A protein has these predicted regions:
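Extracytoplasmic/lumenal domain signature
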Residues: 1-27, 32-82, 86-114
């Protein structure tokens, strides 16, 4: 089975051409978008940013790994499911770790910005 990331034109309800291959087949969480960029978390722990216009992969960050934290406690990320990324003040926020439905456990809040 081939998986694809596709944009849909709302008025006719048809996919834009061409569809992009290679997205994760397990992207159950809510999408988050800003002008020209769509963020998608997946069960493999990756947070990906796609160009809204053509679906091109712009950025990919693996959250399913150990992290040093500001309070010195080790934390581990996992699957990204449920709520999507929150975008505010030029930053993107996610919580990594979701053990339900076969996901990878963890519990680490992450913030991305310039």
């Amino acid at each position: 089975m081939k998986h694809r990331l596709a944009a849909v034109l709302l008025a006719p309800g048809k996919p834009c051409d061409p569809p992009r291959l290679g997205c994760s087949p397990a992207q159950p969480g809510a999408l988050a978008a800003i002008p020209a960029v769509v963020f998608s978390g997946s069960m493999d722990g990756h947070l990906r940013a796609f160009a809204a216009g053509d679906g091109k992969l712009l950025w990919d960050f693996d959250t399913a790994k150990p992290f040093d934290t500001v309070n010195g406690v080790n934390a581990t990320g996992g699957s990204l499911d449920g709520a999507g990324a929150v975008i505010s003040g030029g930053m993107v926020f996610v919580n990594s770790g979701y053990p339900r439905f076969g996901g990878m456990p963890g519990n680490v809040p992450l913030a991305f910005g310039n």
